[in-house]
Amino acid sequence: MTPSLYNPLAIASKPFPAIYSEKILIFTIFSAFAEFERDMIVERTQEGKMLAKQNPDFREGRPKKFTKQQINHALTLLENHSYKQVEDMTGISVSTLVRAKKKKAAEAING
C-alpha cells in the first residue's frame, strides 16, 4: 500500500527507496510550476479584460455573426419561403432563424 501523496506525515513516517522520494520531489516541483502558470494566465486575462473594458465600444463575449438588419431581413423572407430556402438565400442557419423568430415573438408579447 502506497501512502497518500497529500499526507506528508504518511510519507515521512515510512521508509521508501530514493526513487520514490525523487518522484515525489519532481511531481511537487512540476505541480508548483503548473499552478504558477495557471495563476499567471488568469492574471493576464483579467488585466486584458480590464484594459478592454475601458473602451466604450467593448462588448464582452462572442461577437454577433449577423446584424439585426440581416436577421430582420431573413425573418421577412420567412413569410414567403421555407426555413431551408431562407437559409440557402441568406446563409443564416435554421436554428438561428428559429431562435430569432422566438425572440421576436417574445418581444412582441412583452411590448
From Swiss-Prot:
A molecular function annotated in GO for this UniProt entry is: DNA binding
InterPro entries linked:
Cry35Ab1_HTH, Homeodomain-like_sf, Resolv_N, Resolvase-like_N_sf
Q: Which keywords are on file for this protein?
A: DNA-binding
One Pfam family linked to the record: HTH_49
Has UniProt tagged this entry with the keyword DNA-binding? yes
Q: What residue stretches are annotated with the Resolvase/invertase-type recombinase catalytic domain?
A: 1-56
DNA-binding region, as residue ranges, is located at 83-102
| Cystine pairs | none
Recorded hits in Gene3D superfamilies, A to Z, give: 6.10.250.10, Homeodomain-like
To which protein family does this belong?
Answer: Belongs to the site-specific recombinase resolvase family.
The name of this protein is Resolvase homolog YefC
